[in-house]
Structures are given as structure tokens and as C-alpha cells.
A protein has these predicted regions:
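Boundary at the C-terminal end of the N-terminal hydrophobic targeting segment
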Residues: 31-35
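Proline-aspartate-enriched helix->loop->beta-strand connector
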Residues: 260-274
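N-terminal signal peptide c-region/cleavage motif recognized by signal peptidases
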Residues: 26-30
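Sec-dependent N-terminal signal peptides
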Residues: 11-25
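Carboxylate/His-rich catalytic cores and anion/metal-binding grooves
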Residues: 170, 187-210
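Intrinsic-disorder/low-complexity accessory segments
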Residues: 36-160, 164-188, 237, 243, ...
Length: 874
């Protein structure tokens, strides 16, 4: 019609020689209206294009593309799509059973597929228990015993090639037919965990998919390849779950470790991604950087499996590398934790497309290629393991026997750990030990060990003569000298130090000093069945780990609450007396209180297991009376965490996690670019994590005025540099050049460069600080020394101003882990915590991370004190 109209117009108004040009124009217009641009590369391939061609596939098993409506790699699979397909496979295949092992913080299912030949299904539980019995006894298993594989994918959500490869692998195991599949499944068991980190995977899938057009863009500058804050690497609270295998701060890790100990697999795979310009890495890593408690035979078997990965990539002409860059030292990551249990943990690292396609020095890297490579090494793992099956079976039994011999021949009989004055921290540690299948006994008589007294029923003894000898040795290590000083992650994770609990090594010659009994029970806090309504006031100590949570619940309910600056002794309604330390919380009944105060207080205290005392009078036998000005009101805080581009998502996430899950405090997270606008919203506390801050001059001025008008500004680690540069915090930080000057570079070769760099770092080590327990930032602490976790070589110049440096590193501060002696000397006796009063407000600086990975319970309360007890600093 359009062409006809144009032809008509041409006849009437244009000369005949012009008509062809008009008609051509009409044709072009008509074509553009009806055009359907076809993408040259949609990305992705049908599932069988990823899989071996010498295998046939059962046509009754649905393919991923038939269920999801797209080829694998065409889009980034979301977790809901992934789980849907796994359920479809389980419904259609008699090889697969599916179990929901837990849920993430965002309520996504954690799935585990158990895959084996149908003939094994009736006997699957007896096969599992026989394997566990052999692991417990160390008896050599028969040659026909099954291998158990735990195939795990994408613990970092923005490293998605693993979980997308799991689609193809699951199909292969469900639908594949022939000798290769029979050899794998007839007498072996595959546990498939398709997504270690569902929340992060879904976050990144949304990012990558929302930026994909019909034409794939390989430009590394495009927004698809420049992920926003926070990244999909982390879980809901922005934690790196590949550091949580030991720490178990999150439900994803707790569920996974439960299944690990239920099955004790022979091989566990851990699929990752790395920089786009890299190639492909598979273990073993740097041999000299493996954990020394891991047997050398583990590396030998890993090398044997590596030969099969290499053979597969050689056949495809793919680039790869091994035995460099990555280590196997930290016990809390996916390729190392299994090694300490007689399993073979294997790390795989694929160069990342970080989207659907990206340019690299090796040419365009398509998402489908990254998926294909992860499938290749998944299959080569099966091939290599079956070829080395007798050696792998023998290794696990030898591991058990060797572990028993190490415990028997060593000088240490065990470790003793005391409760201190805080049952909350102590019980949290006990829960962690139980989840790792570590056995302990209750100390039944007062025991003197290592110049410390451990009280009966308030301490545990952990004998090393048990299956978890290697893990126990690792988590209580105080090693400070290492063969290789380069660490991919931290160099210490001492559990007793993390929980700030007294502990001691028990040498075999001192075992008689530790008395335990099978019927001994740990002392529990004495909790009132009901509190008397006639009390003058109620009070509870600030010592317990969960005291801030009880306080916050009361503030949320509108309870009028006060905190005591000084210790006092009070008369109780039961005619007894009780001493309350500084920071104790007092609830006077004479003030306006909610009608349900009594039931609220009783319910919350019992839930948190915190003793609450009923006071008979406001007149105290010693110390401040209840109406004293030194017992100050605490108002409900309104806390802002500064986040956004440039700020450490890990540290912000750790603080958010602490406030949200352990205190019950609803903190706001505001991007630094929007901080200026937020300052008028009534925040009482603003917290800066490590980061690169670029606040405007107007925002900085407004923030400083906010402090001077009564606000509390808190910073940690590198945020202190920013505070110092703006003269908010009275602190002088040692220049990086001065730190570098401490290290002699004369006669060093180019090959020494990496080792020198490693010496200048603090490789996640434990440092001891001397603390002022009369200072509000340390209310609730009873010992004058505290183990702090240090991951930075930032040093505050030593200075002394009364009352403003309540924590300093000791003269010999290194307790565990690696730090070069030059750094240790620089850090010794320097401030660890600094405060500066500014007008009506205060600025607080922590040189270390008080919330490290949700594990360092011992320093957590410093942050709560900065929130709830900071009124005493103004």
C-alpha cells in the first residue's frame, strides 16, 4: 500500500525520470517496518554439543533447552531455573534422587542430587554407612567399594560457568547411555551440588541478563562487564562463602558441611573463575604453600588426576596451567577443608567472560566456552578417578591410620578451653565444634594448665586422639613461622582466640592435671522462671555476647533503659546481693514503661539465655545509686552504614550481618554518593568500612557538623586514613613509603619481587592488644588483653593522649599467623583503638576489622559498645 501511494504521488508531482528513486525509497521504508534483525551469535549451544560424542542419550530425558527454552550459555541461568530443571530430571530419571538440604538467607533452596545406577538405589544408605564405617575404623576397603564424588559449583555467584555447566553434567548423568556411563554409575555415587551460592548466582544472572542485547558486546568497557556494587560474588550478606567452610557463619555452609560429613566423599570439586585474560587452572597449586598437615599423598593423587585434565585440554588445544598462583593453606576454603578429612579437594579456575562474551588477550571469550571447559574438567575428574580408583580407596584408609599415628606419636594430648565470663561466645564455639564433628569432654574439676586455672563445669577438654586430629591441630595452631611466607588468604584462624576464650595446650605429661567425667555437664546461666512485678528496677550484665540483642529488643519495644558508667552492688528482692560491672543495663520501673514490660523482659531474656535480676531498692550498698547521673539513659540508635562503589562490600556486609542477625538492629545502608542528603534524617551513628571515599566538600562539611552536633562517627581500617586526612580523628598514620623503607631491597633479584611483596603484608594474623576495660568501648570485657585479627599493615604512629587510646598492641603482639618481624616491631605498642571528641559528638577509629568474616566473636562487642555505650564518650 505504501509503495502504491508513493507511485501515485510520483506520477502526479515528479517527473518520470525521478520515479525509480522514489520507488526505491518506498521499498526501503517498507522493509524497515517489517525487518527482523537476526543476531549473528545468540550465544549458547544445545546440551549435547557440550558433551562427549561417543555417548548416546536417552530421548525420554528432557534436555535443558527443552525445559528452559534456551540453549545453555545463551542466557545466565537463574537459580529458580536451575532447581526447576534438576527437579524435572529427578522426576524423569531413576538414577537421581533430590534432597533439599537447607535454604539460603533469601529462602532459596539448597539442593543435593544423589546420582547412581538404578540397581544401587535400594542399597544407597547401606553403601553410605559402610563407607563411613570404613572411614571411622581405617580398615582397608575392598577393591569394589564405591567412589563418592561431591561435585560442587559456583560458590562465587559471579563465576557462573560452574552452575551453568551443572545443567549439562546433570543431563549427562541422567540421560547418558553406554559403557562410559555404566563404568561411572554402576559402582560409584555422584553427589551433585549445582549451586553453592544461590543468592549470589541469581544476583549476577540478573545483572548479566539485563544488559544483554540481541547483539553480543565483547567490549570490556560495556556495563555488562562492569558489575555494580555489591557484586554477585558474595551471598546475601556479602560474605565470601569460599572462606566459610570452617567458620560456618551462614546457612549455605552449614548445610554443605552437614552433607560433607554425612558422606565423606573421596573427591570434592570446587569450580571457580578468574581474570578474563587468564586461561584455565587446575590443582595441584604451589606445593610449598599447601597446609603442612595435608599429606603429601594428597598432592600425588591430585597430580594423577591433573594428568587427565591436561589430556582433555591437549586434545582440544586449550591453554591451561597448574602448580602456580594458588595455594592450599587456609583450612576454611573449598579445596582445603576436604584435604584435612582424607578427601581430595580440587580447585578449578576458568578465565571469566563476566557476561556473555568479552575480549581477552587470547581472543573473544564466550560464556559458552567457559561452560564447556568446566564440563571438560568435570568429566576428566570422573575419568581420572576411575583410572586411579584403587589408589584413591587405599588413600582414605591410609589417611585414617596415619592420622591415628600422628595423634599417638605427638607431644600434645589435647586443648583445654574455658568459658570466661560469657556463655554466649562459649556456646557459639561449642556449636561450631559440633558441626565439624569434633568431640570434647566437660572438665569436672578445677584444672591448672599452662599457668591458667580452668574451672569445673566451665571448661572443655578436646583430646587430639580422635578422627578430627588434623582439623583440631589446625584450629588451635599458634604457628608464627612458615616455610613459605606467601599466602593466598589468611595464615591463622585460631578458634579460641577468635572467640576470646582462655585456652591452653595440654601436653601429654600434663594430661593428669585435666579431670573430665562422662556425666559432667556445663554450667548454664541461672534463668528466672518469672520476674517479680514488685521490683524497684531490673538489671542485667553487659558481659554476655547477646546482651546488646536484649538491649535492642527492649529499645524497640519502647522500654526506658539506662547504662551504668561504674560498677555497683545492688540489693535484690530475694534478699541477696549482686555486683554489676560497668556497662550493665538498668530498667527502672518507676519510669514510664510499656504495660507488658515484665513479660517482654522475661521472654527475651530466656530466649537469649541472659540472667536478669530484680532490684529491691535504688539505694546500693556500694557504687552508684540507681538514680545517679552516672547511670545514663540509652536512646534507640539509628545507624547508617556507608556503602556503594569504592567501599568494601565484605566489611559492610559483615557489620550488616552482625547488627541484623546477632543484635537485631535495623541498620540503614546508604551509598556514599547519597550520604549528604541522608544526614538530615536523624541518624545517631554513621559507620565507615575500609574503602576509597570521594565525598564532596559540602558533604564532608555537613558530616563534620553532624558530629559536632552530637553524632558518633565510626571507622575501621583504611577509613582511618580518610578520617585523619580530614582532621576528624586525631591520629597520625605511618606513610606507606616509611613501611617500605623498613625492608632492605639491596641485592634482590627480579625473582625476589613476589616474596618481598608478601613480606610487606600482614597475612591475616592474630595480634594481642592491651585494653582498658574501664573505657566504654570495652564495657563487658573482663580480661585486659584481647586477640585482634589483623589483615592490614596500616600502622598508627605511637602517641599518648589520656583517655583516647583505650587499646594498644602489646610489646610482642604477634600471637599466631605470619607477619614479618619488621612489621611486628612497627606495630608493637601502637594504638589499636582511638577516639576523638568533636564538639558534642565523638569519632571512633578501629585499626582492625572487629567483625572479620562473622567469626571473630571476641571483638564483635567493640562495635556494639560504639553504638550503645558511646554516650559516655561525649
Amino acid at each position: 500500500m505504501l509503495a502504491a501511494l508513493v507511485r501515485t504521488a510520483t506520477i502526479s508531482i515528479f517527473p518520470k525520470w525521478f520515479a525509480p528513486f522514489i520507488v526505491l525509497t518506498a521499498v526501503c521504508v517498507s522493509a524497515s517496518v517489517n525487518a527482523n534483525i537476526v543476531a549473528l551469535d545468540k550465544g549458547g549451544k544445545p546440551v549435547q554439543a557440550y558433551l562427549p560424542t561417543d555417548v548416546t542419550y536417552n530421548p525420554d530425558i528432557p534436555t535443558p533447552e527443552s525445559v528452559l527454552g534456551a540453549n545453555i550459555g545463551q542466557w545466565h541461568v537463574r537459580h529458580d531455573q536451575l532447581t526447576h530443571y534438576m527437579r524435572v530430571l529427578a522426576d524423569h530419571s531413576d538414577r537421581i534422587s533430590l534432597e533439599v538440604t537447607g535454604r539460603t538467607h533469601e529462602n532459596r533452596e539448597l539442593l543435593l542430587l544423589t546420582i547412581t545406577a538404578p540397581s544401587n538405589r535400594p542399597n544407597i544408605e547401606s553403601m553410605r554407612t559402610a563407607h563411613i564405617d570404613a572411614m571411622n575404623s581405617g580398615e582397608k576397603v575392598k577393591a569394589g567399594a564405591p567412589l563418592i564424588f561431591y561435585m560442587g559449583y559456583s560458590i562465587h555467584g559471579n563465576e557462573p560457568s560452574g552452575s551453568n555447566a551443572a545443567l549439562a553434567l546433570a543431563y549427562y548423568l541422567a540421560a547418558g547411555q553406554g559403557a562410559r556411563i555404566d563404568a561411572l554409575l554402576n559402582n560409584n555415587i555422584v553427589l551433585l551440588d549445582p549451586s553453592f551460592n544461590p543468592d549470589g548466582l541469581s544476583r549476577f544472572a540478573q545483572w548479566a541478563n539485563m544488559h544483554k542485547g540481541k547483539q553480543l558486546v565483547a567490549d570490556s568497557n560495556t556495563r555488562e562487564h562492569d558489575e555494580g556494587w555489591p557484586s554477585g560474588r558474595t551471598n546475601h550478606y556479602w560474605f565470601d562463602l569460599n572462606r566459610d567452610w570452617l567458620l560456618l557463619a551462614h546457612p549455605e555452609s552449614q548445610a554443605r558441611i552437614k552433607q560433607f560429613h554425612r558422606w565423606r566423599p573421596h573427591i570434592l570439586t570446587d569450580f571457580h573463575e578468574m581474570g578474563t585474560d587468564s586461561t584455565y587452572f587446575f590443582q595441584p597449586g604451589v606445593r610449598s604453600r599447601k597446609n603442612p598437615i595435608t599429606p603429601d599423598e594428597n598432592v600425588t593423587l591430585t597430580e594423577a588426576l591433573a594428568a587427565y585434565h591436561a589430556k582433555a585440554f591437549d586434545k582440544q588445544g586449550k591453554l591451561y596451567f597448574s602448580e602456580e598462583a594458588f595455594d592450599d593453606f587456609y583450612a576454611g576454603k573449598g579445596s582445603t577443608y576436604p584435604d584435612l578429612h582424607g578427601s581430595i579437594g580440587i580447585l578449578f579456575e576458568q578465565a571469566s567472560s563476566r557476561g556473555h562474551i568479552q575480549e581477552s588477550i587470547n581472543g573473544p571469550l564466550a560464556f559458552s566456552t567457559t561452560i564447556a571447559n568446566q564440563i571438560t574438567t568435570s568429566l576428566s575428574t570422573f575419568e581420572g578417578a576411575l583410572a586411579n580408583k584403587p589408589a584413591i580407596l587405599d588413600y582414605q584408609s591410609a589417611f585414617v591410620k596415619d592420622t591415628q599415628a600422628l595423634a599417638k606419636d605427638g607431644d600434645i594430648s589435647g586443648y583445654i578451653v574455658g568459658e570466661s565470663s560469657d556463655s554466649g561466645r562459649f556456646n557459639a564455639m561449642l556449636s561450631l565444634l559440633k558441626q565439624h564433628n569434633i568431640k570434647f569432654e566437660v572438665v569436672s574439676k578445677d584444672s591448672d594448665v599452662g599457668k591458667q586455672t580452668f574451672n569445673a563445669n566451665r571448661a572443655i577438654y578436646i583430646p587430639v586422639a580422635q578422627a578430627q586430629y588434623r582439623l583440631i591441630t589446625s584450629i588451635f595452631s599458634t604457628q608464627t613461622s612458615f616455610e613459605n611466607n606467601t599466602f593466598y588468604d589468611v595464615s591463622s584462624w585460631n578458634m579460641a582466640m577468635a572467640f576470646n576464650l582462655p585456652f591452653s595446650v595440654v601436653e601429654k605429661r600434663d594430661t593428669r592435671n585435666v579431670k573430665t567425667a562422662a556425666n559432667a555437664k556445663l554450667a548454664m546461666p541461672v534463668l528466672s522462671e518469672s520476674l517479680p512485678a514488685s521490683a524497684y528496677a531490673y538489671a542485667f550484665s553487659w558481659n554476655d555476647y547477646y546482651a546488646p540483642a536484649l538491649l535492642q529488643s527492649l529499645l524497640e519495644a519502647g522500654v526506658s533503659v539506662r547504662s551504668s558508667e561504674n560498677a555497683f552492688e545492688a540489693k535484690l528482692v530475694n534478699n541477696q546481693r549482686h555486683t554489676f560491672t560497668s556497662g550493665s543495663i538498668v530498667i527502672p520501673t518507676g519510669l514510664v514503661q510499656p504495660e507488658n514490660l515484665l513479660s517482654l523482659l522475661t521472654e527475651q531474656a530466656r530466649a537469649l539465655r541472659i540472667p536478669v535480676y530484680a532490684l529491691a531498692s535504688g539505694l546500693t550498698p556500694t557504687g552508684s545509686d540507681i538514680g545517679s547521673r552516672s547511670i545514663k539513659p540509652i536512646l534507640g540508635p539509628k545507624v547508617l552504614l556507608v556503602g556503594g562503589e569504592g567501599v568494601s562490600e565484605y566489611e559492610v556486609g559483615e557489620m550488616w550481618h552482625y547488627f541484623d542477625t546477632r543484635v537485631g538492629l535495623p541498620a540503614s545502608i546508604v551509598e556514599q554518593q547519597k550520604l549528604g542528603n541522608a544526614l538530615q534524617s536523624g541518624y545517631t551513628h554513621i559507620v565507615f568500612a575500609s574503602g576509597q571515599y570521594t565525598l564532596s566538600d559540602d558533604t564532608k562539611d555537613a558530616l563534620f557538623n553532624w558530629v559536632k552536633n552530637g553524632g558518633v562517627l565510626i571507622g575501621q581500617k583504611s577509613a582511618l586514613r580518610y578520617f585523619a586526612a580530614n582532621e576528624w580523628l586525631n591520629v597520625d598514620i605511618v606513610d606507606r613509603e616509611e613501611i617500605d623503607s623498613q625492608f632492605d631491597e639491596d641485592k634482590l633479584t627480579f625473582g625476589d619481587k613476589s616474596a618481598l611483596y608478601a613480606r610487606k603484608l600482614v597475612a591475616g594474623a592474630v595480634y594481642e592488644a592491651e585494653i582498658d576495660i574501664t573505657h566504654p568501648l570495652f564495657y563487658g570485657y573482663t580480661d585486659t588483653t584481647l586477640s585482634m585479627f589483623k589483615t592490614s599493615n596500616m600502622v598508627v604512629n605511637n602517641y599518648y593522649t589520656p583517655f583516647t587510646t583505650p587499646a594498644r598492641y602489646t610489646s610482642a603482639p604477634l600471637l599466631a599467623g605470619f607477619s614479618d618481624e619488621k612489621l611486628v616491631k612497627l606495630i608493637a605498642e601502637t594504638p589499636a583503638v582511638i577516639t576523638t571528641q568533636q564538639g558534642k559528638g565523638v569519632v571512633i577509629g578501629f585499626t582492625d576489622n572487629t567483625q572479620f568474616r562473622g567469626y571473630w566473636y571476641g571483638t564483635n562487642k567493640m562495635l556494639s559498645n560504639a553504638i550503645y555505650q558511646s554516650g559516655f564518650l561525649k
